[in-house]
Amino acid sequence: KGELSQYVNPLITVTISDNEVVVSRSSDEKQERAFHGLYRALINNMVVGVSEGYKAELELVGVGYRVSNTGNVMELALGFTHPIFMVLPAEIKVETKTERNKNPLITLESCDKQLLGAVCAKIRSFRKPEPYKGKGVKFVGEVIRRKSGKSAGAK
């Protein structure tokens, strides 16, 4: 599905043997243990990403919230006086779906989990879900903690 590369700190050694990637460290110092776990997870994410790929779905909840894309340029209408145009990196494939009486969906696919998460966070940051009505850009399946709002008759 693609090709990924990663810088590795000199304290950590990465070797490939018998179709297996082995991450090892020279000592048990705290920083080396931390780097060991970090690079093991990053390499695992890269292997899974290149073999299977990653997918993220965002949902636009709110009246008049729309999304459309032409190639890798996404146009978001999120209740502002202007549309938001976002140019996505070439490694990310985007698909938008708008059905009648359903919230618009944005489906992002990539082999790079880190980049995919950063782009999703950027899109979500344009209009985060608010706790009173739940309007905004949220991940599919994300539960928004709701608040009751003004308490009626509380004196």
At which residue positions do the language-model features occur?
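N-terminal intrinsically disordered, cationic/polar leader segments
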Residues: 1-36, 40-48, 52-121, 125-155
